[in-house]
From Swiss-Prot:
The chain crosses the membrane at residues 95-114, 128-148, 155-175, 192-216, 226-247, 270-290, 305-325, 357-377, 385-405, 451-471. Keywords: Antiport, Cell membrane, Cytoplasmic vesicle, Glycoprotein, Ion transport, Membrane, Phosphoprotein, Sodium, Sodium transport, Transmembrane, Transmembrane helix, Transport. It catalyses: Na(+)(in) + H(+)(out) = Na(+)(out) + H(+)(in); Na(+)(out) + NH4(+)(in) = Na(+)(in) + NH4(+)(out). It comes from Rattus norvegicus. This is Sodium/hydrogen exchanger 4. Glycans are attached at residue 342. One of its GO terms (cellular component) is apical plasma membrane. The gene is Slc9a4.
Length: 717
């Protein structure tokens, strides 16, 4: 009972603190609305304080207007952080529901308090806050920590699904809702085709962050995880590009008609915006990697370079009306490959946790704003539009999933099963992106904006609460194929070997696939890019670098899980010995590294095998005599045992088929017959004597002189 009561008391403390913060936020909003003046500048504040000459110095003053904006921003961030802490206090709660559900509930609670105290809709974000401050950290974190190899191995299926799937969902939902709006009984006749298509583009933006958390816990197979991850990474960018193009069409349609040329220009702009954003991101990633080559002595600014250049890529792309989301994604992927090898380990840890912190805070604020906007007067309800929107989202999601994956499975070595496709269909959770795009619709172009916001909230609430909560049990019920354990160093080395081997086989056969593309890029990378972008481009063994990377990763994981704290601390005697050991100089370390590199690069020499074709001639007299003596002893022993000479076939013997079964009697009987035949034949002894005499004369000559001993080696071989 004691620990349970302590946990309950701690939970009640957190809940009470959350309530206090919500009341503070509500009171700050009331003060903001009741104050006739806005935020004062320091000069205006000084002028106001010095306007009355008879005013005395007061001991205590209250000036909320001066700190209003940073105070409220700090309160919002603190409220979001405490909400996440409270969510993870109960260890069972994250397994039952996604984190976004609790954040929406907390936001709805805050909105209810604000609306109840002042009877006015609570404050929400505008377009500049969302697109310039909240969205970039989320996209940067997703791109930087993306598993690169699985992503590019499935890049074809990801682009096929994320790109074409977003277009099918957007136009399918938009056209279906347009036909529903033509029914006069529903009272939706004032919503035209462009407005429905625009609503379809924003409602098709999925946000399966909660689903990815469930997949990581369930350890589903890698290709299923990468399809959902790739959709989450690219779908927002595609939806935002389509959203901006359709808004431009809506503005144009207000003043003039849209022609076929405008539609072709819109399609061309869709391609240029996407490709231009990727190009900008890669360029800024290369620039940041090149600058980090020279930061070995000032490593404190390395995290600043990473964040500033990634944010600059987003702003530069948005300045030229390109896709900032795709730009910052490409920049993050490029920096992940090159910048990590230049920055120190401390800078890498700082980048990792600061990036995750910014992404978590931004996403939490968006979900809380979503809950806040639920309560207020900015809603319009229409049963037909809301219900058909929810139905069409599910229908077109199913059509796009099963159609596109049926086509892609025809070209895949490992196709997606029906279970995988069902999980992908069920993972279409709408979230912060759809709500933000709906809330940022210009009211002058969309008179039914409140209806769009209401329908978006209903779809988001249904997918987040219902699908987000039930996706875990569904994965366990369907028994989706699980992933393998983490690759060991042996598996990693064999994967690299097989990639290189497959590229060579394809080159010999005249075929082409992604193995050759990867191999050519690796050669180009090692030959040019790494020499320019990497600080110390010295030839190192890939085994050494991979071992160092795995050891570093294992040490970080042990430090994060607390395993290093369980290791016994060294005794004072050991500490003295460690301190007494002389540290290696940089020259010694460099020489050791060179020795290891050379030895690991060298191929072990194979021992030569000798035969009669490569045997070197020997001129030693002792060796020739020894060979002759041993040969004579061998022949004498064979004759003493009653055996015939190996090169003489005794008379009357049969031709045996070797490497097959004999014709007749077993081995002992055959040996007896051969012995009887050979012992009674005097020609064998005479032939043996003459042969030995001829060999001696051939080697030593008729007068006993040594001739060419190498002839003996040839004869014996």
């Amino acid at each position: 009972m004691g620990p349970a009561m302590l946990r309950a008391f701690s939970s009640w403390k957190w809940l009470l603190l959350l309530m206090v913060l919500t009341c503070l936020e509500a009171s700050s909003y009331v003060n903001e609305s009741s104050s006739p003046t806005g935020q004062q500048t320091p000069d205006a504040r000084f002028a106001a304080s010095s306007s009355d000459p008879d005013e005395r110095i007061s001991v205590f003053e209250l000036d909320y207007d001066y700190v209003q904006i940073p105070y409220e921003v700090t309160l919002w961030i603190l409220l979001a952080s405490l909400a996440k802490i409270g969510f993870h206090l109960y260890h069972r709660l994250p397994h039952l529901m996604p984190e976004s559900c609790l954040l929406i509930i907390v936001g709805a609670l805050v909105g209810s308090i604000i609306f109840g105290t002042h009877h006015k809709s609570p404050p929400v974000m505008d377009s500049s806050i969302y697109f310039l401050y909240l969205l970039p950290p989320i996209v940067l974190e997703s791109g930087y920590f993306m598993p690169t190899r699985p992503f590019f191995e499935n890049i074809g299926s990801i682009l096929w699904w994320a790109g074409l799937g977003a277009l099918i969902n957007a136009f399918g939902i938009g056209l279906s809702l347009y036909f529903i709006c033509q029914i006069k009984a529903f009272g939706l006749g004032d919503i035209n085709l462009l407005q429905n298509l625009l609503f379809g583009s924003l409602i098709s933006a999925v946000d399966p962050v909660a689903v990815l958390a469930v997949f990581e816990e369930a350890r589903v197979n890698e290709q299923l995880y990468m399809m959902i991850f790739g959709e989450a990474l690219l779908n927002d960018g595609i939806s935002v590009v389509l959203y901006n193009i359709l808004i431009a069409f809506t503005k144009m349609h207000k003043f003039e008609d849209i022609e076929a040329v405008d539609i072709l220009a819109g399609c061309a702009r869709f391609v240029i915006v996407g490709c231009g954003g990727v190009f900008f991101g890669i360029i800024f990633g290369f620039i940041s990697a090149f600058i980090t080559r020279f930061t070995q002595n000032i490593s404190a600014i390395e995290p600043l370079i990473v964040f500033m250049f990634s944010y600059l890529s987003y702003l530069a792309a948005e300045t030229l009306y390109l896709s900032g989301i795709l730009a910052i994604t490409a920049c993050a992927v490029t920096m992940k490959k090159y910048v990590e090898e230049n920055v120190s380990q401390t800078s890498y840890t700082t980048i990792k946790y600061f990036m995750k912190m910014l992404s978590s805070v931004s996403e939490t604020l968006i979900f809380i704003f979503m809950g806040v906007s639920t309560v207020g007067k900015n809603h319009e309800w229409n049963w037909a539009f809301v219900c058909f929107t929810l139905a069409f989202c599910q229908i077109w999601r199913a059509i796009s999933v099963f159609t596109l994956f049926y086509v892609s499975n025809q070209f895949r070595t490992f196709p997606f099963s029906i279970k995988d496709q069902l999980i992908i269909f069920y993972s279409g959770v709408r979230g912060a992106g759809s709500f933000s795009l709906a809330f940022l619709l210009p009211l002058t172009l969309f008179p039914r904006k409140k209806l769009f916001v209401t329908a978006t909230l209903v779809v988001t609430y249904f997918t987040v609460f219902f699908q987000g909560i039930t996706i875990g049990p569904l994965v366990r019920y369907l028994d989706v194929r699980k992933t393998n354990k983490k690759e060991s160093i042996n598996e990693e080395l064999h994967i690299r070997l097989m990639d290189h081997l497959k590229a060579g086989i394809e080159d010999v056969c005249g075929q082409w696939s992604h193995y050759q593309v990867r191999d050519k890029f690796k050669k180009f990378d090692h030959r040019y890019l790494r020499k320019i972008l990497i600080r110390r481009n010295q030839p190192k063994s890939s085994i050494v670098s991979l071992y160092k990377k795995l050891e570093m990763k294992q040490a970080i994981e042990m430090a994060e899980t607390g395993l290093l704290s369980s290791v016994a601390s060294p005794t004072p005697y050991q500490s003295e010995r460690i301190q007494g050991i002389k540290r290696l100089s940089p020259e010694d370390v460099e020489s050791m590294r060179d020795i290891l590199t050379r030895n690991m690069y060298q191929v072990r020499q194979r021992t030569l095998s000798y035969n009669k074709y490569n045997l070197k001639p020997q001129t030693s007299e002792k060796q020739a005599k020894e060979i002759l003596i041993r040969r004579q002893n061998t022949l004498r022993e064979s004759l003493r045992k009653g055996q015939s000479l190996p090169w003489v076939k005794p008379a009357g013997t049969k031709n045996f088929r070797y490497l097959s079964f004999p014709y007749s009697n077993p081995q002992p009987a055959r040996r007896g017959a051969r012995a009887a035949e050979s012992t009674g034949n005097p020609c064998c002894w005479l032939l043996h004597f003459l042969l030995c005499r001829a060999m001696v004369e051939k080697i030593w000559g008729p007068g006993g002189q040594e001739t060419q001993p190498r002839l003996l080696c040839r004869n014996l071989n």
